[in-house]
């Protein structure tokens, strides 16, 4: 008869969790998913995050000229220099995300005679916990705070790459971002009306997803210097060097990708079209289009309809508090003597941006 493991200590339970991960061969558990892609937790955070500390994350940017330069006489010219405060500070506040799961000792005890069942019980709880975290973080990342009273939601890319002028064929018209209630706010603490050089690049495709879209895309690339880095991102796995995730990406809707692929199918390869259609990816100027299901639904205040969100992750990036990147903790349940709880915590900013004019751009059908 199997020995009971009821009444185990916290240390013993943590040992069981670790042993479960290390010793038992996983059996796949069926799980329905809310999304097909989880780029935030699978790619963006692991590869492009920066580790921070302090009360907030800050960077400095020059948004004004000193007015000290100019042509003058050849000799014995009196200096006329003025001291200007040209630096401004962009500030992103940290936000706290937490989720967890509960393990009941009785359930563990019931399955103690069957190693696979005991493993699957623990695994299923953990899978549900991690899926919940991935869902929540994906939605929050590509969204915005509900209102000025919302002090718990992070600010994502649409705090920095914003809607501009209706029918704009392409300019730095992206003004202050919107809360979900339609009111504006100043991402980073600096208003774009006061500092117009913080405005991001925006173009309105007016729903015309044809060759004219490529014209808008090409112009946006040139105006923002959005291009594939000369030095590729490489990573070594078990001594094998491979290309890592690219720091410049287009995120877009299914409708945009369908039309882009249609243009690619109809192109004359002998001419050497800029639009690629091979190797399982659709690319433009060597930059990949990534599907994001969230963009299949229009947003009045964030991005309009059928957006192309171009992001340079070396300029705009998530910041995570050091030692709090999905940090796990296990403890006894305070109100159930037969249970343990496991939590994962993430302290992060959402996105911080060093310079909105160089972070990418937004092309969409304006609301």
Task: List the predicted regions and their residue ranges.
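Short, conserved beta-strand edge motifs with alternating hydrophobic and charged residues
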Residues: 249-253
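Short, internal active-site loops enriched in acidic
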Residues: 149, 254-258
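Glycine- and acidic
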Residues: 110-116, 366
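Short, glycine/acidic-rich hinge or "gate" loops at secondary-structure transitions
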Residues: 138-160
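A generic secondary-structure signal for well-formed alpha-helical elements
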Residues: 133-144, 206, 221-224
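Sequence/fold signature of self-assembling virion shell proteins
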Residues: 2-19, 24-38, 42, 154-233, ...
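Internal, well-ordered alpha/beta segment that forms a basic, Gly-enriched binding/recognition surface
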Residues: 101, 105, 113, 119-137, ...
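Assembly/oligomerization interface modules of large self-assembling protein complexes
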Residues: 33-105, 160-163, 170-171
């Amino acid at each position: 008869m199997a020995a009971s493991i009821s009444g185990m200590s916290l240390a013993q339970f943590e040992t069981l969790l670790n042993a479960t991960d290390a010793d038992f061969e996983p059996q796949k558990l069926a799980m329905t998913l809310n999304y097909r892609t989880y780029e935030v937790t699978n790619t963006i955070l692991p590869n492009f995050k920066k580790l921070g500390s302090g009360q907030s994350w800050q960077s400095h940017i020059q948004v004004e000229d000193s007015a000290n330069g100019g042509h003058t006489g050849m000799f014995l010219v009196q200096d006329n220099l003025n001291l200007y405060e040209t630096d401004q500070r962009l500030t992103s506040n940290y936000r706290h995300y937490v989720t967890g799961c509960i393990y009941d000792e009785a359930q563990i005890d019931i399955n103690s005679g069957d190693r696979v069942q005991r493993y699957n019980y623990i695994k299923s709880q953990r899978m549900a916990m991690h899926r919940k975290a991935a869902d929540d973080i994906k939605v929050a990342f590509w969204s915005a705070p509900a209102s000025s009273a919302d002090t718990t939601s992070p600010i994502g890319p649409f705090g920095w790459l914003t809607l501009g002028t209706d029918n704009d064929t392409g300019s730095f018209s992206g003004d202050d971002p919107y809360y979900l209630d339609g009111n504006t706010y100043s991402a980073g603490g600096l208003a774009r009306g006061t500092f117009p050089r913080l405005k991001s690049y925006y173009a309105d495709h007016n729903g015309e997803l044809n060759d004219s879209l490529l014209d808008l895309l090409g112009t946006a690339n040139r105006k923002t210097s959005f291009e594939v880095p000369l030095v590729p991102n490489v990573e070594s796995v078990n001594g094998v060097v491979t290309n890592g995730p690219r720091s410049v990406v287009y995120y877009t809707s299914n409708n945009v990708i369908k039309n882009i692929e249609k243009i690619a199918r109809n192109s004359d390869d002998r001419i050497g079209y800029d639009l690629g259609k091979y190797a399982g990816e659709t690319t433009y100027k060597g930059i990949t289009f990534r599907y994001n299901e969230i963009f299949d639904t229009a947003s009045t205040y964030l991005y309009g309809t059928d957006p192309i969100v171009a992001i340079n992750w070396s300029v705009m990036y998530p910041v995570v508090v050091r030692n709090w990147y999905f940090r796990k903790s296990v403890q006894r349940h305070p109100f159930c003597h037969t249970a343990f709880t496991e939590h994962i915590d993430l302290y992060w900013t959402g996105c911080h941006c060093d310079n909105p004019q160089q972070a990418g751009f937004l092309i969409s059908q304006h609301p």
